[in-house]
Regions:
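Mixed-charge, Lys/Arg-enriched low-complexity segments
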Residues: 37-72
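Short N-terminal "domain-start" leader segments
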Residues: 1-23, 27-31
Length: 72
């Protein structure tokens, strides 16, 4: 079961409960990518790094969307 974590203007991602995996996708559903294992861990670390940036960069959705677009 996937839980939505982030929904941006172009890209979003969901977390798969119980596995630690992520599903990245474009909001038009034309592209998606399933992250598991080390890839999921690296993605999670990148999102945590973005979330911990100081203002004015903290909570900047563009940085999160850029991180997702790298995988797609």
């Amino acid at each position: 079961m996937f839980l939505p974590v982030y929904q941006g203007q172009k890209y979003s991602y969901s977390y798969e409960v119980g596995t630690g995996n992520y599903m990245l996708f474009s909001n038009d559903y034309k592209s998606h990518f399933y992250l598991q294992g080390d890839d999921a861990r690296i993605f999670e670390e990148e999102i945590e790094r973005i979330d911990n940036l100081p203002p004015p960069y903290s909570n900047d959705g563009r940085l999160t969307e850029n991180a997702i677009s790298v995988y797609l």
